Amino acid sequence: MKYLLIFLLVLAIFVISVTLGAQNDQQVTFNYLLAQGEYRISTLLAVLFAAGFAIGWLICGLFWLRVRVSLARAERKIKRLENQLSPATDVAVVPHSSAAKE
C-alpha cells in the first residue's frame, strides 16, 4: 500500500510538470556544463524529472543491494555459528551424584 501511494505521488508530480510545461510553450535557454541549448519548458521539465527519478532509483537500488548483501553475509555467519554450536549440544549430559545412597 505504501509503494502504491509513493507511485501515485510520483505520477501526480510528473503529470503536473508535463501539464505546466505544455501550457508554457516558450523556449528557454538551458546552460549545462559544456554548452547551452534552446528547449521547450515541457521537454526540459519532463527530461530533468525523469533523469532525477532514474538517478534516485539507482542510488536507492545500490543502498538496497548493499543491505541485502550484508544481510546474506550475516545469515551465513549465523548458520555457520549454529552448526559449530550444535555438535557441542548434541552430547547429552548425564547428572552424576557423588553421594551414594546406602
UniProtKB/Swiss-Prot annotation:
One GO cellular-component annotation of the UniProt record comes to:
plasma membrane
Subcellular location field: Cell inner membrane
The induction comment states: Induced by heat shock, via RpoH.
Q: Short name of one Pfam family for this protein?
A: LapA_dom
**Residues in coiled coil:** 64-92
Picking any one GO biological process from the record gives: lipopolysaccharide metabolic process
Annotated keywords: Cell inner membrane, Cell membrane, Coiled coil, Membrane, Stress response, Transmembrane, Transmembrane helix
How does this protein sit in the membrane? Multi-pass membrane protein
Ranges facing Periplasmic side: 24-43
Q: What does this protein do?
A: Involved in the assembly of lipopolysaccharide (LPS).
Recorded family membership? Belongs to the LapA family.
Q: What is this protein called?
A: Lipopolysaccharide assembly protein A
| Organism, scientific name | Escherichia coli (strain K12)
Q: What is the lineage of its organism?
A: Bacteria, Pseudomonadati, Pseudomonadota, Gammaproteobacteria, Enterobacterales
